């Protein structure tokens, strides 16, 4: 199978601009599996709950999932991408898996980082593994974790024990340790991993977060 990630710098709170930026790049990719960063439609460093509410969407009914579905169908690829999810009055830092058939699955980030727990609920769906196929019809099992989930060895181990062959890892990494650790996660669990990080900077109340990029694909 062929796998790819798309690394870019999302514009804070501009969903339309971020979808356009991805659309301009993703259509040139030729891969069975494409992974996008965490919160790719919204940016990360939310100034308030009102800002988050402005960009959060239901999954799979939201417009961003619809865009992902369009790309998955037109590219004949499975996509994994991070989105701010709204369910009623609750918000989750989620990843959506979209297949070329249009079928969607959701994972909600379990291990929240820094100030995320002031806005998002911890994920309540557990670590999930999904049955997918390559465009040649070869089946494989796809696990998903989001950003800081990498820090806890049990996350990748749980996915591996559930039968994952590949772990997709949408991220917004600001600390330098993950790129060194993901090869270990792949090796110790005998899985392939794909970390799709973003780059750029975001500011809030005089504090700046610098996202490190350094997306990577690791083998066992």
PLM feature segments, named:
Residues 7-9, 37, 108, 197:
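Residue-level recognition of beta-strand->loop/alpha-helix junctions
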Residues 1-5:
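Extreme N-terminal starter segment of soluble prokaryotic enzymes
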Residues 7-25:
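N-terminal phosphate-binding loop and adjacent alpha-helix
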Residues 63-78, 151-220:
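CN hydrolase (nitrilase-like) catalytic-core segments centered on the catalytic cysteine
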Residues 78-82, 108-115, 196-200:
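Short Pro/Gly-enriched beta-strand edge/turn motifs at strand-loop
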Residues 24-100, 106, 175-189:
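Cys-nucleophile CN-hydrolase/nitrilase-fold catalytic domain and related Cys-dependent amidase chemistry
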Residues 57, 86-162, 171, 177-184, ...:
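Active-site catalytic loop in hydrolytic enzyme cores
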